[in-house]
Amino acid sequence: MAERCQRIDEEVVASRDEISSLPDDLLIQILLLVPIKDAVGTMILSKRWRYVWTLLPKLEYSDPGDECESVWKFLEKLLELHKAPFLETLCIQLDVGKLVANAVDRFVRKLELELHWTAEPTSLPKSLYTCKTLVELTLSDKIIVDVPSSVCLPSLNILRLFYVVFKDENSLERLISSCSVLARSKVGLAISDNRDYRFAKVHKLRLEKPHIDVVCHTDDKFLKAISLVTYLVLPLEDPMALDFRGFTFTRLGKLVICPHGHLWLDIIPLILNNSPKLRFLAITSVMDIDPEISHCHGTNQGTVPRCLSAHLDEEFVWHGYRGNEEETQLIRYIFANAKCLKKREISTFHLEEREVIETVLKSMPRVSTTSTLVFK
């Protein structure tokens, strides 16, 4: 009698679980209809179900607002255990705002956030702009910088903004003004998003060590707005040739130029003329500049820039010097007019012409008889 009851129970269970007897292909199609977490959860039903989910050809995850740490652990384990011959689709949708808010709630100190260039512009939670523990903040691509009036970032000392979208013309000013210990600021503008914005108020900021890295095309509004910086890293491109007329970098002491295009040699004399207190000048060239198309007409001006005659006393550095006619004209101009210069450091890409270039440089007349020449 007991054996008969047991056999009946087994038959009932078997009839209730007929779905488990279906082939893998059908079970996979069924699991594709449910959320990925539910599909993974079927592994505890029985041995038959333990590995079915690992054969799914598509993995789609939509953030339900879970804790960010558990989300990434789940996704990592999901891919680690996945056994399908081909993964046709991997789609992960996360709520960036929730992730950032969770990070702020956990007293984040360093936050780097970059969106893919195809993503929709995304705003961040207001709590980010009142995070008291945040020391370093990097925002890149398609992030809307919408800074509330209540912004307060007392610990922030490194700020990097690359190709972000400013909500309005006051957002940048409010953000930087709220950082009482900000020592270094790297600011990049996507002109397609900011062309009509005015940055007139940015120049009123007083940073202890203003340091701006301009990492994309800029217009004259932005350059004028940062005209009180003391340290500037500046990529020079052809369209920027006219941006340096009509305003002055009154406090600029250190300038690093990264040339691109073919008109950059013409732009440098304009910058020197508008930087009266410059003490350090570096040029970092790249390999792909065509030396045959470069020009340098600005050195023919009658008046020597004040920075050359009175202030450029620390160092002149040129990495990637080629020694062509136009570059030689510029470097000869600097050597002949930098009265206070203490050190000159030159390096070249053309190792086969190193000795010739070094000989030419050493033979150039220089007004500062005490300056040393280091050739690398």
UniProtKB/Swiss-Prot annotation:
Domain FBD: 296-348
PROSITE patterns (UniProt xref): FBOX
SUPFAM superfamilies attached to this UniProt entry: F-box domain
Entries under InterPro entries matching the protein: F-box-like_dom_sf, F-box_dom, FBD, FBL13/AtMIF1-like, LRR_FXL15/At3g58940/PEG3-like
Boundaries of every F-box domain copy: 16-75
Tree of life domain: Eukaryota
One Pfam family it belongs to: F-box
Keyword hit for Repeat: yes
The LRR repeat ranges on this chain: 131-154, 199-224
Keywords of the record: Leucine-rich repeat, Repeat
Protein name: Putative F-box/FBD/LRR-repeat protein At5g52460
Organism: Arabidopsis thaliana (Mouse-ear cress)
UniProt lineage: Eukaryota, Viridiplantae, Streptophyta, Embryophyta, Tracheophyta
